Amino acid sequence: GGWTGVMGKRACTPAMMFSVALAMLQRDGRWLLQLRDDIDSIIYPGHWGLFGGHLEPGESPAESVVRELKEEISWSPPATLQPWFSDASGGRNVHVFRGELTVPLDQLYLKEGQDLRLASLEELRSEWIWSDHCREKRPIAPGLNIVIRRLLAEMHDV
């Protein structure tokens, strides 16, 4: 690897990157999103994103995504979520899983974030999605663009 910066510090190696595991859950042709809290200390406050989070030490992405779903919406997938793709272009190692949300939205108990919603493909493409909780449209997190592009590419392949 090359040397960068005035202090001659080595560029970050992938091993040093944050790893996150996220869930792209589908129900009735819509996808489950989380509206992040309006807290300045978190990444992309007040943006729509996917449920999931950072891997704990020694945890696999698959274990992490199941734990996070239980912590964030009190739901455990009845079947194993399928690894969909991984992406490290945004400075963190993102593992995206996909699966079916097997319960209606009103059976989820939101414990992290300020709102949740099943968004249509049209809404995802518009990049601004209505929040009932906030009574206004909120932007999608930049990281979600990779997921949406992947989704659109697959739909064109079909």
PLM feature spans:
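Short connector loops at helix/strand junctions that flank enzyme active sites
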Residues: F18, Q26, P45-L50, G91-V94, ...
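Conserved N-terminal beta-strand and adjoining loop/helix that marks the start
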Residues: G8-L33, F51
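Unchanged
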Residues: H54-K137
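Short secondary-structure boundary/capping segments
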Residues: A15, A23-M24, D40-S41, S86-D87, ...
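Conserved Nudix-box catalytic region and its N-terminal flanking loop in Nudix hydrolases
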Residues: R30-E71
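Charged phosphate-binding loop/patch that engages nucleotide di/tri-phosphates or the phosphate backbone
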Residues: E136-V158
